[in-house]
Amino acid sequence: MDKLLIVNADDFGLSKGQNYGIVEACRHGVVASTTAMVNGEAVEHAAALSRELPGLGVGMHFVLTLGMPLSPMPGLTRSGQLGKWIWQMAEQGTLPLDEIARELDCQFNRFVDLFGREPTHIDSHHHVHMIPAIFPLVAQFAARKGVAMRVDRQVQASHDLTLSRAPTTQGYSSDFYGDEISETLFLQVLDASAARGEQSFEMMAHPAFVDNTVRKSAYCWSRLAELDVLTSPSLKYAIAERGYRLGSFLDL
């Protein structure tokens, strides 16, 4: 039986350039899954585009590090904004877990309002759901809602986190990322998964057209390089040749 490869494009809703890049990678490439930032400046645009792509599985990209939250979070925000200080707070044991749980629920409900259905799965911006204090909240929430979630098993093992009851892939990698994006890198990451015997594997990606919002990101031009690789006909052929079928978290 074919192995399942989920190429998930993160950051749907970040900007129109990001959205159009994800749509391009779906229509002409190997992306069949994405995750939406419901507090993103272009999330309504993303929702409208998704209705033209019934084959694109759309999950929720839980956001605790960028923009404004949907609910009051005085314990986490600074001047009303979310930010990357969340890791320092995690190390200090000062995370407002009640606020985070409430925000997770608000973002989920906002997703349903925008997209007209529940997300295929849950992951997060900057992998905040893998912070040890936050992981159980998200895992229990996903299991309760009956949706899948992204699990970085290396982080899970290093922090001895209890495995979620929510469906997930056997493998996951964020290694298709950085300044040296290429088809060779993509296939190296995929071959490493096959060598581990994983029958289902998620590859994180960030394909985009660069616009003013994307240019503000520390990870900018590589998003365009990712788009070139992910829409390459030779990549699609190489994936099929290795015995993989492309899909989304609905195929688990």
Curated annotation (Swiss-Prot):
Pathway: Glycan degradation; chitin degradation. GO terms for biological process: chitin catabolic process; diacetylchitobiose catabolic process; polysaccharide catabolic process. Keywords: Carbohydrate metabolism, Chitin degradation, Cytoplasm, Hydrolase, Magnesium, Metal-binding, Polysaccharide degradation. GO terms for cellular component: cytoplasm. It is found in: Cytoplasm. SUPFAM superfamilies: Glycoside hydrolase/deacetylase. It is an enzyme of class 3 (hydrolase). One of its GO terms (molecular function) is chitin disaccharide deacetylase activity. Its main location: cytoplasm. Involved in the degradation of chitin. ChbG is essential for growth on the acetylated chitooligosaccharides chitobiose and chitotriose but is dispensable for growth on cellobiose and chitosan dimer, the deacetylated form of chitobiose. Deacetylation of chitobiose-6-P and chitotriose-6-P is necessary for both the activation of the chb promoter by the regulatory protein ChbR and the hydrolysis of phosphorylated beta-glucosides by the phospho-beta-glucosidase ChbF. This is Chitooligosaccharide deacetylase. It comes from Enterobacter sp. (strain 638).
